[in-house]
Amino acid sequence: MRPIQSPPGVSVPVKSRPRRRPDLTLPLPQRDVSLAVPLPLPPTSGGSGGSSGSAPSSGGSASSTNTNSSIEAKNYSDLVRGNRIGSGAGGTVYKVIHRPSSRLYALKVIYGNHEETVRRQICREIEILRDVNHPNVVKCHEMFDQNGEIQVLLEFMDKGSLEGAHVWKEQQLADLSRQILSGLAYLHSRHIVHRDIKPSNLLINSAKNVKIADFGVSRILAQTMDPCNSSVGTIAYMSPERINTDLNQGKYDGYAGDIWSLGVSILEFYLGRFPFPVSRQGDWASLMCAICMSQPPEAPATASPEFRHFISCCLQREPGKRRSAMQLLQHPFILRASPSQNRSPQNLHQLLPPPRPLSSSSSPTT
């Protein structure tokens, strides 16, 4: 059967999808030069309106991390795969050794035989994340394509995740929160929304440096600020407007969504349990009702006014009322975490209890 053709000289209008909606344009977090932690501006290649200079490099452990990033894709054979240290919906993570340098890394093997368009998007996001360089963000060193399987070489965090950690001392919790906020503010300044902030995606090493990890569901935002409406991430830590799209007129601010997830995680550290009146492993209906219908959880009355206010700034039902990561870095609760006090060896040893390992599996693989 031949397709129906329009008569000569008659043009048929073709409907085109609108490229952007002005009402969905969201403000970017503004750079605050008074921050104790310098945050580089978004790269100029992302569009107009950025700084003409290049982003300043971060100091501290980030500079030392750069010395490990000289592994080329052609040297994949130099990696010796060891134990599996974690697994999730996006893939499996293995501990590997780079034989020429004897350095340890984490190798994430991404699941699935993806279509070409999906593979290009994954590779594009990984390439952008390779340029991320901050002391509180897990470094992405290299990407490999092995027989159609995408594998990502990451910084190795030897103490695992903070899932199950109970940090009831506010001074220590303030230092923990400051590190996470520092990394989150840096990511947001580069138009990167994580979308899955939770304790199991916050890693710690033997130096007690806390870093944000697992960008398997992160999204790079263009200058047009396309809305992030896809349901990725862990529902227990999702913001109300992300679960129920009828809230907030259907608009989703990815930055504010990360702040909600951060607030739930920090309150969970303080309480030693999931802060909502349901189990985070419960059924979806119970979780959604608790998050969308009930009042946001609060810090207990026994906590300090500063901490109670900090949690309130994160867990506002209306996204526009939540503070940005850069604003929260100036909150009185965070400012009490003086690096000169919290970075002494004695306090570092007591900062957190030994976290649970990423995985109970210890069988070596090849």
Curated annotation (Swiss-Prot):
The modification Phosphoserine is found at S6, S230. It comes from the Eukaryota. GO terms for molecular function: ATP binding; MAP kinase kinase activity; protein serine kinase activity; protein serine/threonine kinase activity; protein tyrosine kinase activity. ATP binds at I85, G86, S87, G88, A89, G90, G91, T92, V93, K108. Expressed higher in stems and leaves than in flowers and roots. CDD domains: PKc_MAPKK_plant_like. It catalyses: L-seryl-[protein] + ATP = O-phospho-L-seryl-[protein] + ADP + H(+); L-threonyl-[protein] + ATP = O-phospho-L-threonyl-[protein] + ADP + H(+); L-tyrosyl-[protein] + ATP = O-phospho-L-tyrosyl-[protein] + ADP + H(+). Phosphorylation at Thr-224 and Ser-230 by MAP kinase kinase kinases positively regulates kinase activity. Phosphorylation at Ser-230 and Thr-234 by GSK3/Shaggy-like kinase ASKs negatively regulates kinase activity. Phosphorylated by MAPKKK5. Changing K108M: Loss of activity. Activated through serine and threonine phosphorylation by MEKK1. Inhibited through phosphorylation by GSK3/Shaggy-like kinase ASKs. Disruption phenotype: RNAi double mutants MKK4 and MKK5 have a strong abscission defect. Higher sensitivity to high salt and drought stresses. It is found in: Cytoplasm; Nucleus; Plastid, Chloroplast stroma. Residues 1-69, 339-366 are annotated as: Disordered. Keywords: ATP-binding, Chloroplast, Cytoplasm, Hypersensitive response, Kinase, Nucleotide-binding, Nucleus, Phosphoprotein, Plant defense, Plastid, Serine/threonine-protein kinase, Transferase. Changing T224D: Constitutively active. Its main location: cytoplasm. The active site is at D196. Involved in the second phase of hydrogen peroxide generation during hypersensitive response-like cell death. Involved in the innate immune MAP kinase signaling cascade (MEKK1, MKK4/MKK5 and MPK3/MPK6) downstream of bacterial flagellin receptor FLS2. Activates by phosphorylation the downstream MPK3 and MPK6. YDA-MKK4/MKK5-MPK3/MPK6 module regulates stomatal cell fate before the guard mother cell (GMC) is specified. This MAPK cascade also functions downstream of the ER receptor in regulating coordinated local cell proliferation, which shapes the morphology of plant organs. Interacts with ASK7/BIN2. Interacts with P.syringae type III effector HopF2. Interacts with MPK6. Interacts with RACK1A, RACK1B and RACK1C. Interacts with MAPKKK5 mainly in the cytosol. Belongs to the protein kinase superfamily. STE Ser/Thr protein kinase family. MAP kinase kinase subfamily. This is Mitogen-activated protein kinase kinase 4.
